[in-house]
């Protein structure tokens, strides 16, 4: 585990989180993690997708207790049908991140194994992915406020099951893991040993290429791009290319994924426009280039104003005293009292900044500089909290 570190001390206030479904792989992870350190906490997610899921989740919590592993049950709210596996995965990680933060976990261990890696790479190979996709699942990545660590990526699932059998530890078999309606299940059942070996070669070659490309991109962004704490970016004309636009659009939007390549190429041909909730426009007084700002129409809805609340998936409100019933939403027309030229903030970017509203009136604006709000409103501390980097997501993957 040392190579995945650094790790916090093994104390009550800094446990390491475990994502445990109750299946063989995650139960093996829990067993091994508990042998590694005393302070771990398992999070068991009930997706509520099957009638028996609640009972299975409770059984898993009981089994973890028998392994001397502290466990918390997380039950997801119902979500719309369609793209069920994708929606369930997204909702699961949202719940896991929030649970980790509440328990003081900086790291969450996830039980992806060698077979998962093979299937992921082969699936992306079939869909003609480039180095970004073919580099596969990374052993360490960052999601929001936590690290996701996958220490079992080089271990076959058969070895994990043998570990459980040797310790007389039971697990749950999820019937959806055998449902051939899902592409991943078909690959899991149909991939030959030769194809799995080819997938591993593809993954290693793509990983090296991805690292090289990311290093080049980071150098180019360092030379031509400027990130501003108000959530917008200036990109000099010499730095405008497909890769730079793609990662910067993702950065400004806070999206988990880059926009589609074809859409980025179309945007480059136009020279300006909107994509993935981001406006790309000429920089004007800010220099020779373009600026990228959040698209106002794409902003998230108001959320209750409380310490730690995240609005639009990007801005987190720190501790502050607000009236009961206050909400976090965009500044919008409230920016009329601001001297945007003096503050150096584009009009479109300022409208999309967060503020605290109460009964239709802005009571707290973001802290932008001396006398930004005058007597119009107080100030609140918002921090950028999307957890989406421009580059470097894969710097743990060597």
UniProtKB/Swiss-Prot annotation:
InterPro entries documented for this protein: Rossmann-like_a/b/a_fold, TilS/TtcA_N, tRNA_Ile_lys_synt, tRNA_Ile_lys_synt_N
Enzyme class: ligase
PANTHER family: TRNA(ILE)-LYSIDINE SYNTHASE-RELATED (PTHR43033), TRNA(ILE)-LYSIDINE SYNTHETASE (PTHR43033:SF5)
Name of the protein in question: tRNA(Ile)-lysidine synthase
Enzyme Commission number(s) from the entry: 6.3.4.19
Function text: Ligates lysine onto the cytidine present at position 34 of the AUA codon-specific tRNA(Ile) that contains the anticodon CAU, in an ATP-dependent manner. Cytidine is converted to lysidine, thus changing the amino acid specificity of the tRNA from methionine to isoleucine.
Entry binding sites for ATP: 21-26
Domains (record comment): The N-terminal region contains the highly conserved SGGXDS motif, predicted to be a P-loop motif involved in ATP binding.
Keywords assigned by UniProt, alphabetized: ATP-binding, Cytoplasm, Ligase, Nucleotide-binding, tRNA processing
Family: Belongs to the tRNA(Ile)-lysidine synthase family.
HAMAP family the UniProt entry points to: tRNA_Ile_lys_synt
Entry's localization field: Cytoplasm
GO biological process per UniProt: tRNA modification
GO cellular component: cytoplasm
Gene: tilS
Reaction catalysis annotation: cytidine(34) in tRNA(Ile2) + L-lysine + ATP = lysidine(34) in tRNA(Ile2) + AMP + diphosphate + H(+)
Gene3D superfamilies in alphabetical order: HUPs
Molecular functions per Gene Ontology: ATP binding; tRNA(Ile)-lysidine synthase activity
Record's keyword annotation contains tRNA processing: yes
Alphabetized SUPFAM superfamilies for the sequence: Adenine nucleotide alpha hydrolases-like (SSF52402)
């Amino acid at each position: 585990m040392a190579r995945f570190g650094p790790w916090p001390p093994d104390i009550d206030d800094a446990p390491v989180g475990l994502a445990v479904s109750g299946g063989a792989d995650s139960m093996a992870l829990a067993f091994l993690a508990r042998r590694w350190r005393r302070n771990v906490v398992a999070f068991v997610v009930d997706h509520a997708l099957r009638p028996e899921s609640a009972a299975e989740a409770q059984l898993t919590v009981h089994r973890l207790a028998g392994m001397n592993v502290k466990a918390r049950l997380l039950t997801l709210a119902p979500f719309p049908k369609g793209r069920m596996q994708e929606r369930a995965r997204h909702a699961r990680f949202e719940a896991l991140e929030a649970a980790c933060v509440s328990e003081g976990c900086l790291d969450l261990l996830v039980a992806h194994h060698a077979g998962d890696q093979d299937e992921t790479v082969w699936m992306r190979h079939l869909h003609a992915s480039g180095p970004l996709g073919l580099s596969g699942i990374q052993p360490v990545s960052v999601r929001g406020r936590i690290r996701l660590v996958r220490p079992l990526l080089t271990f076959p699932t058969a070895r994990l099951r043998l570990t459980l059998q040797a310790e007389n530890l039971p697990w749950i078999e999820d019937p959806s893991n055998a449902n051939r309606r899902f592409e991943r299940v078909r690959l899991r059942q149909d991939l030959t040993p030769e194809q799995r070996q080819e997938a591993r070669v593809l993954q290693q070659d793509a990983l090296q290429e991805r690292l090289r490309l990311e290093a080049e991109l980071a150098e180019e962004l360092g030379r031509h791009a400027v990130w501003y704490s108000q959530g917008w970016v200036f990109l000099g004309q010499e730095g405008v290319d497909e890769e730079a636009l793609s990662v910067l659009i993702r950065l400004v939007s806070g999206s988990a994924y880059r926009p589609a390549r074809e859409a980025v190429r179309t945007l480059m041909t136009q020279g300006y426009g909107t994509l993935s909730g981001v406006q790309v426009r000429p920089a004007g007084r800010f220099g020779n280039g373009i600026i990228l700002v959040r698209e106002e129409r794409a902003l998230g809805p108001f959320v209750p104003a409380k310490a730690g609340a995240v609005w639009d998936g990007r801005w987190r409100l720190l501790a502050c005293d607000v009236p009961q019933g206050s909400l976090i939403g965009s500044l919008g027309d409230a920016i009329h009292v601001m001297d945007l030229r003096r503050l150096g903030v584009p009009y479109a970017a300022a409208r999309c900044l967060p503020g605290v509203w109460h009964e239709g009136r802005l009571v707290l604006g973001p802290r932008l500089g001396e006398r930004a709000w005058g007597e119009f409103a107080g100030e609140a501390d918002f921090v950028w909290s999307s957890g989406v980097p421009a580059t470097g997501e894969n710097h743990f993957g060597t």
